[in-house]
Amino acid sequence: MLRIGILGAGRIGQVHGRTLKQLDTAQAVAVSDHFDEAAKKLADEHGAKVMTTDEIIASPDVDAVIIGTPTDTHFDIIQTAAKAGKAIFCEKPVDLSTDRIRQCLDEVAKANVPFMTAFN
């Protein structure tokens, strides 16, 4: 069972949460959000823990992260998650700067972790 941390409990985090509930191979185990009530609501729906983004990324009980946070946070989260060895699914856009996107891709390649960008 792939253990997923959902970063961002807004609309898109809720969409990904509903998708995870339909899978037999993955489950949400942790949720973070800037708004505590949003994180708690989504976590409660999944029997998951509310944690900070840094705690989720550092947790040995989390295999992968779904990044559904504002675009300006993606760069730092991707860098940190890759260095921590987490598989990463990131909402688009990865960043608004092509240089920063390249840096993210370099870090992901160096860490040899799975990385996927969402596109509807």
Please give the residue ranges for each predicted region.
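Short helix-capping segments at alpha-helix termini
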Residues: 23-25, 84, 109-113
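N-terminal Rossmann-like dinucleotide-binding module
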Residues: 1-46
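Beta-loop-alpha module in the N-terminal Rossmann-like domain of NAD(P)-dependent dehydrogenases
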Residues: 48-107
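Short, Asp-centered acidic motifs that coordinate Mg2+ and/or phosphate
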Residues: 30, 63-64, 114
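Glycine- and other small-residue-rich loops at beta-strand/loop junctions that grip anionic moieties
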Residues: 9, 67, 93, 118-119
